[in-house]
């Protein structure tokens, strides 16, 4: 009979539980440190990306009435034209866009969503440089709101950034966004994952003193105030009819159509509206360009512009999704448009079976929010299609100062 020893030799024993625990602890610490370092590097890269300002140029062909090969999203000759970095490096010189088959009659600089707060001084310098290109690269300035995020940005940054444009004598127009009326406040980021109807601002968060410096500057700038108003002007020998609405996202919009000077039509903060209270638009004369401005690209507002023969509507608000998948594929739009339309230039109304944008509105009456399938041919009501440019904006929220696969951009749009 074999007798087993009371204990195994020391060299034949496995590692003790204490030794295993120590090894696991060391490995978990290394993994945690590596993960933390990677997260910091990613965050740093995303924050720097939010300061890499660019200009994108689009040349829009005339008469966009026929369906395009990609009718719901049409990036037309985009060209990265200028880039800057946070370290005060001089911007790269503008690269000329591809020569269009129809030379543009009018070039529009579109600025949106600067969201000025302390820490965006580099954007002020970049915009001052861009102002020096007035007359060389663009003939008209359009501002579509959300220029502010804080009292500091209102008092010290917004005027410093925009005044050089006005001092050139460049004609322009503007509408306001919700954050030109009240400061950014933290919110639930998951709420952006759903398509949202206009929500109406709570009056308790509106401060009459917020934005007063920006509004005072704009009032003295000589630019057209298109907040629920319309006007017309000659720019480079082109008769330009302008119409705009105050921010539909907080239901301040009152659509006024195109035609002789009218407005502004007042709208109280958070007042519910479906955007139609104005006189009927005048018939569109030959050779006239009709330009619409709205901070948020809600479908009911786009439908109104399309019904009145707009050639181009400029919007912001979406930040292009701000945090996107590779290739700039947005996850959210923060309005009732699909994420695929969160930035860029596209034709409206959409056509084809894949069009999932809200298009349920009675032209003669009140707009209705909702969604439906595609619409045929030239869009609802037999109207011609128009271009819509949704800017990804130049800034970010104070609470999420980063961008992922979504560079901050200003647009220059050439209209033939």
Positions of PLM-derived features:
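Core catalytic region of metal-dependent phosphoesterases/phosphodiesterases
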Residues: 62, 117-234
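N-terminal active-site segment of His-dependent metallophosphoesterases
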Residues: 9-14, 19-23, 30-160
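Intrinsically disordered, low-complexity domain-flanking/linker segments in eukaryotic proteins
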Residues: 68-101, 189-197, 201, 267-281, ...
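Solvent-exposed loop/turn segments at secondary-structure junctions
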Residues: 116, 147-150, 178-182, 233, ...
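Binuclear metal-dependent hydrolase catalytic cores centered on His/Asp/Glu-rich metal-binding motifs
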Residues: 194-223, 235-294, 299-303, 400-403
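Active-site neighborhood of phospho(di)ester-bond hydrolases with catalytic His/Asp-centered motifs
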Residues: 110-112, 140-146, 171-178, 226-228, ...
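Conserved beta-sheet core of the metallophosphoesterase superfamily
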Residues: 297-411
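Beta-strand-turn-beta hairpins that frame and shape the catalytic cleft
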Residues: 62-67, 77, 85-88, 94-109, ...
């Amino acid at each position: 009979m074999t007798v087993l020893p009371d204990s195994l030799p020391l060299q034949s024993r496995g590692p003790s539980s204490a030794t295993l625990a120590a090894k696991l602890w060391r490995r978990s610490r290394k993994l945690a440190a590596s993960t933390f370092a990677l997260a910091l590097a990613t965050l740093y890269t995303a924050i720097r990306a939010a300061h890499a300002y660019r200009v994108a140029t689009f040349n829009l062909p005339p008469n966009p009435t026929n369906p395009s090969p990609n009718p719901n999203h049409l990036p037309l000759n985009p060209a990265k034209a200028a880039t800057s970095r946070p370290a005060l490096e001089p911007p790269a010189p503008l690269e000329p866009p591809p020569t269009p088959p129809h030379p543009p009659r009018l070039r529009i600089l579109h600025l949106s969503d600067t969201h000025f707060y302390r820490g965006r001084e580099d954007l002020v310098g970049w915009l001052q440089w861009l102002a020096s290109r007035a007359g060389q690269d663009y003939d008209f300035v359009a501002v579509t709101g959300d220029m502010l995020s804080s009292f500091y940005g209102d008092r010290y940054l917004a005027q410093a950034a925009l005044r050089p444009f006005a001092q050139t004598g460049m004609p322009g127009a503007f509408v306001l966004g919700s954050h030109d009326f009240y400061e950014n406040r933290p919110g639930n980021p998951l709420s952006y994952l759903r398509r949202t109807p206009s929500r109406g601002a709570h009056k308790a968060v509106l401060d009459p003193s917020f934005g007063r410096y920006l509004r005072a500057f704009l009032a003295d700038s000589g630019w057209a105030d298109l907040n629920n108003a319309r006007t017309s002007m000659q720019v480079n020998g082109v008769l330009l009819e302008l119409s705009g609405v105050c921010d539909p996202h907080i239901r301040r919009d009152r659509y006024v159509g195109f035609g002789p000077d009218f407005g502004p039509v007042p709208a109280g903060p958070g007042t519910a509206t479906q955007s139609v209270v104005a006189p009927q638009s005048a018939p569109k004369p030959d050779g006239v360009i009709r330009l619409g401005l709205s901070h948020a690209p809600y479908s009911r507002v786009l439908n109104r512009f399309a019904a009145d023969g707009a050639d181009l509507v400029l919007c912001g608000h979406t930040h292009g999704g701000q945090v996107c998948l590779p290739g700039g594929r947005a996850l959210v739009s923060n309005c009732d448009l699909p994420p695929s339309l969160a930035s860029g230039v596209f034709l409206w109304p959409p056509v084809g079976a894949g069009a999932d944008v809200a298009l349920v509105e009675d032209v003669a009456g009140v707009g209705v929010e909702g969604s439906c399938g595609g619409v045929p041919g030239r869009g609802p009501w037999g109207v011609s299609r128009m271009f819509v440019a949704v800017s990804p904006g130049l800034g970010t929220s104070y609470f999420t100062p980063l961008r992922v696969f979504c560079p901050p951009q200003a647009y220059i749009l050439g209209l033939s």
